[in-house]
Amino acid sequence: MAEIPEGANVTILNRNEKKARELISKLGLKKVPGIIRVTFRKKDNQIFAIEKPEVFRSVGGNYVVFGEAKVDNFTQRLAAAQQQAQSQTATKTPEDIQADMQAAAVANENKTEGDAAEEDVDAGDLSNDDIDLVVQQTNATKGQAIKALKEHNGDIVNAIMSLSK
């Protein structure tokens, strides 16, 4: 018997799986590369997951999946993620929290100064109703609404669309 080198990836197939693979090769199924995980969901939201599956596809669009199916407990993974997020926020010191709050306040002040500069835009021949409509629909500032209306020659729809992007 030949020796298997260290670090080699060896898969031992049972008898039923060997037979199934032989039948698949006779049916002409094509192997689908690049699939990392397959999940199946039942009506009661129970999830079965197959990690590193071998997936084959028939001409008609049906799939055959080989691999070890495990019951995936989504609630446990969600609880672990929440616990990890809480531990990350708990590690902040009061000084870090104060620094974050001051940085947010400075950013907010800079934003309001920029908004005040935009308010000085000349409305020209645009009606206040058109400007107010664009502001209401897009939650933009009055200056942004006037600028968009001028860019689109007073077309309200195009101004709203440009600000909604």
Swiss-Prot record:
CDD domains recorded: NAC_NACA, UBA_NAC_like
Keyword Membrane attributed: no
Entry function: Component of the nascent polypeptide-associated complex (NAC), a dynamic component of the ribosomal exit tunnel, protecting the emerging polypeptides from interaction with other cytoplasmic proteins to ensure appropriate nascent protein targeting. The NAC complex also promotes mitochondrial protein import by enhancing productive ribosome interactions with the outer mitochondrial membrane and blocks the inappropriate interaction of ribosomes translating non-secretory nascent polypeptides with translocation sites in the membrane of the endoplasmic reticulum.
Protein name per UniProt: Nascent polypeptide-associated complex subunit alpha
Pfam families for this protein: NAC, UBA_HYPK
SMART domains registered for this protein in UniProt: NAC
Domain UBA stretches: 126-165
Cellular component annotations (GO), alphabetically ordered: extracellular region; fungal biofilm matrix; nascent polypeptide-associated complex; nucleus
Subcellular location: Cytoplasm; Nucleus
Domain NAC-A/B as annotated: residue spans: 14-78
Organism, as annotated: Candida glabrata (strain ATCC 2001 / BCRC 20586 / JCM 3761 / NBRC 0622 / NRRL Y-65 / CBS 138)
